[in-house]
Amino acid sequence: MSSILDELDWRGLIAQSTDRDALAAELAAGPMTLYSGFDPTAPSLHAGHLVPLLTLRRFQQAGHRPIVLAGGATGMIGDPRDTGERTLQTADTVADWADRIRGQLERFVEFDESPTGAIVENNLSWTGALSTIEFLRDVGKYFSVNVMLDRDTVRRRLEGEGISYTEFSYMLLQANDYVQLRKRHGCALQIGGSDQWGNIVAGVRLVRQKLGDTVHAMTTPLVTDSEGKKFGKSTGGGNLWLDPEMTTPYAWYQYFINTADADVVNYLRWFTFLEAGELAELEEATRDRPHQRTAQRRLARELTTLVHGEDATRSVEHASQALFGRGELAALDEPTLAAALREASVAELTPSGPDLITDLLVATGLSASKGAARRTIAEGGVSVNNMKIDSDEWTPQASDFLHGRWLVLRRGKRNIAGVQRVG
């Protein structure tokens, strides 16, 4: 039987680790408690958080106990980043975001009374009670400023506009989290993204210096696509959020269904729990029959179900099929239809019009001009609610509007837009 480290290796999920042999030996000796931290720098986690979250889940399935740490304290400070100082949020805002994120964290690991049952902590519970004197004596005394200045992000910031003491001290707070979790739960491994390596190793050193214990560190790779672009950015450039109010399940599904062939197998390794044999079959399908997009559909289905549940997955799959002419639009509930259309483009239709099909195509951006719209119609490339339009004089009747106010326009096979009747 392969070890959890072997599993992570073949999936490509280990970027760096402290003494690998020592870590493997301790994992083999019995259940280990490990943790990963998530700062509430927004009201929701985003897709980039899935790698460490799912790594916690993999460890749990292998018989180990995960701790998910909400950064109620560190979220008020902010880890230094290359783009400059973070805007400090109020304590109430961070507390609200921490509560929301805690609820999201609880979806990804199992909470029960078993030895592997997950634990949720908030680092505000110990950091908030720490006085300035205690922080400087009990934590700061163990850190060399020279070492802290050598961190890549800090060095780049110092070469630019500089860095505040607030963000400079972040490493100390994160390191102290490891000490506290070691004392409270016997935690022996911290995992995080590879950009957190310096902070995590600082925690390993602090545990050794303060408690005399040897603990471990491991990072997962920062996920980029085959073109080097950061994973998890929506088509508009924003984050792909786990909160359905911030990124709809339809938009989430579409992001993954549109994954490039060059990326889809890696994403299946990193973000799903499919076994090696099935992944090999999906890799073969992508290589031999890329037009079928079998792997992309499986990826989108797995991740939408993981984050939003089976009902949401069925709903968005029905919506996707219906919007692209392979299902019944009238069967879609209005919230799903509206969310799907808003991810494309929606033009409003007022009682005063204009409502000629050529005007609607231009208003939604499906055609650059009325002349272009007429040509597309003449070529048979326009449909409304999956019904082909053969006249450039067509106007919608009341009975054409889905749920009394929506039209679905399509140009060609994949260009979709909506019209919403208002007023």
Curated annotation (Swiss-Prot):
A motif ('KMSKS' region) lies at residues 230-234. One of its GO terms (biological process) is tyrosyl-tRNA aminoacylation. Its main location: cytoplasm. One of its GO terms (molecular function) is tyrosine-tRNA ligase activity. It catalyses: tRNA(Tyr) + L-tyrosine + ATP = L-tyrosyl-tRNA(Tyr) + AMP + diphosphate + H(+). A motif ('HIGH' region) lies at residues 40-49. Belongs to the class-I aminoacyl-tRNA synthetase family. TyrS type 1 subfamily. NCBIfam families: tyrS (TIGR00234). Catalyzes the attachment of tyrosine to tRNA(Tyr) in a two-step reaction: tyrosine is first activated by ATP to form Tyr-AMP and then transferred to the acceptor end of tRNA(Tyr). Homodimer. This is Tyrosine--tRNA ligase. It comes from Mycobacterium sp. (strain KMS). The lineage of its organism: Bacteria, Bacillati, Actinomycetota, Actinomycetes, Mycobacteriales. The gene is tyrS.
